[in-house]
Amino acid sequence: MYELKNKSLEISKVFKDSTNYKDFKDYLYNNKYNLLGFNSSYKIFKGYKELEYTTGILYLQPSDHVAAKTLCPMAELSGCKDPCLRVSGRLGMNNAQLAMARRTVQYLQDPDGFKDRLRTEILKNEKDKYCIRLNGTSDIDWSDLIGSLPNIQFYDYSKVLKRAIKNNLPNYHLTYSASFNNLQSIE
């Protein structure tokens, strides 16, 4: 289990102040909220319209925004911590930020329960042309979950070169995401 940062206390205040829920814990652990967003961005929706692929993406609070230990191990070294995708477009809106924080705290407090819930949601929404991206705004090794769902196609981008090189799961397309700061790792 990850240690939560003091910032998570600020997030809990934001949750309380921005919802009609009386009890923060009920709000935080309410399972009526989806973990995955389906066809939720313009680029992904365009793929759905043109290729008829349904894409589910998991967005968490990345780097060390909620946890004392980062969910993006290469964020600082790669120089992508501050200009992170987490604040672009709709993800930068307050509701999206709160949803990412809620999911992240759920994952950090109960990783096994979170993975079970995620697996159930993936299977419940399965379609013919279907793919899942678990690291929409994080860089977590999900290979155990992905390996347990061999009939589902997954894809991700990672700044962890070793993970990209060692990936041997046939249902997981992992692209190494180079940046100016980590180009030397390719050489």
Give the location of each predicted region.
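Class I S-adenosyl-L-methionine
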Residues: 1-187
